[in-house]
Amino acid sequence: MTLTVDIEIEDEAWTKAEPEVEALVWRAAQAVLDAHEDIEGHGIVILLADDDSVQTLNRDFRQKDYATNVLSFPSVTSPGANPEGQIGDIALAFGVCQREAAEQGKSLAHHLQHLVAHGVLHLLGYDHQDDADAEAMEAFEREILAGLDIPDPYAEPASAEG
């Protein structure tokens, strides 16, 4: 069985801003999945949505009534236990992602790929609830993104001292 990454574009703003958005998303998801041999044969659905859709998902499933950059919904706690082979779904909000990228001085493409990697790691059981877990997750994100030629998303911006 082969691994699948299904990308659903609900908000065309994604393709207007990044014409190669599907390739960017697939590349980031695949980079994480390639580093985890134990999940071969499982699939992920990635929804590129608008802020309203992500706000609805966040409200309905997490009881938080606001749009957020990325949501991850694992299918089960152990991917091997899922008979259909899906490890979960990810949803990304265009407006939130675009604003964050601009605020952080990053390209939308790089920010999107970081958030996809972050979301896939959540599906695989990574978390950032405490400092040790956050450090481990961020280290893995840095490693994955470096392989995609994306700068460290957690690096402090260079100061403009003069």
Swiss-Prot record:
One GO location term (cellular component): cytoplasm
Function, as annotated: Single strand-specific metallo-endoribonuclease involved in late-stage 70S ribosome quality control and in maturation of the 3' terminus of the 16S rRNA.
Signal peptide: none
Co-factor remark: Binds 1 zinc ion.
Subcellular location per the Swiss-Prot or TrEMBL entry: Cytoplasm
Gene3D superfamilies: Metalloproteases ('zincins'), catalytic domain (3.40.390.30)
Cofactor(s) this protein requires: Zn(2+)
Principal subcellular localisation of the protein: cytoplasm
Protein name according to UniProt: Endoribonuclease YbeY
GO annotation (BP), single: rRNA processing
Residues annotated as binding Zn(2+): H118, H122, H128
EC primary class: hydrolase
InterPro entries: MetalPrtase_cat_dom_sf_prd (IPR023091), YbeY (IPR002036), YbeY_CS (IPR020549)
Keyword Chaperone among record annotations: no
Protein family: Belongs to the endoribonuclease YbeY family.
Highest taxon listed in the record's lineage: Bacteria
UniProtKB keywords: Cytoplasm, Endonuclease, Hydrolase, Metal-binding, Nuclease, Ribosome biogenesis, rRNA processing, Zinc
EC assignment: 3.1.-.-
GO MF terms, alphabetically ordered: metalloendopeptidase activity; RNA endonuclease activity; zinc ion binding
SS bonds (residue pairs): none
